[in-house]
Amino acid sequence: MTKEAAINAMEQGGYKVAHRFFGSNEYIAACDDDYYYDEEGLMLPKKDFWGCRQGEAWNTGWRIVG
């Protein structure tokens, strides 16, 4: 799925998503308007999360995880 679809899945559908570059147990999910959380419960500012994930490789390769 695309980056845009992954963001919508998290923010509108409440899903956890992972990218092909993530480890097998890694994911992110939306927490509120400004933060995501990861599989360890760490809060990640959205602007920081996407700030270091720029470029074509991050525009696709997303999936919903259980």
Where are these regions (language model features)?
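Surface-exposed ligand/attachment interfaces on beta-rich extracellular proteins
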Residues: 1-9
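Generic cytosolic/nucleocytoplasmic N-terminal low-complexity/intrinsically disordered segments
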Residues: 2, 15, 45-46
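Short, flexible coil/linker elements and helix-boundary hinge sites characteristic
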Residues: 13-14, 41
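A short, Trp-centered hydrophobic/proline-enriched beta-strand micro-motif
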Residues: 14-20
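Hydrophobic beta-strand residues in large extracellular and virion-surface proteins
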Residues: 17, 28, 36, 62-64
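Acidic, low-complexity, intrinsically disordered interaction modules
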Residues: 23-55
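Short, structured beta-strand segments at or near domain termini in extracellular proteins/domains
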Residues: 55-65
